[in-house]
Curated annotation (Swiss-Prot):
Primary residence: plastid
GO molecular function, one term: structural constituent of ribosome
GO CC, alphabetical: cyanelle; ribonucleoprotein complex; ribosome
GO biological process assignments: translation
Record's keyword terms, sorted: Cyanelle, Plastid, Ribonucleoprotein, Ribosomal protein
Protein name: Large ribosomal subunit protein bL28c
Family: Belongs to the bacterial ribosomal protein bL28 family.
HAMAP family: Ribosomal_bL28
Amino acid sequence: MARQCELTGKKANNGYTVSHSHRRTKCLQKANLQTKRIWSPTLKRWLKLQVSTKVIKDLKRKSIDALLKI
């Protein structure tokens, strides 16, 4: 399974680690993904999704059905 949010599509970002002497080495900034079981009232079943922490925060405000329509 890819390290990508199943709802937003958020994935890793390429960047640099910069030392004090400004030497740059490439690094991969991974998305903060968590596996969550989320209840869907319309589907009447649990959904096991790998989602970003921003989506988990949005789930406290909106239902999963509202987020799936995005």
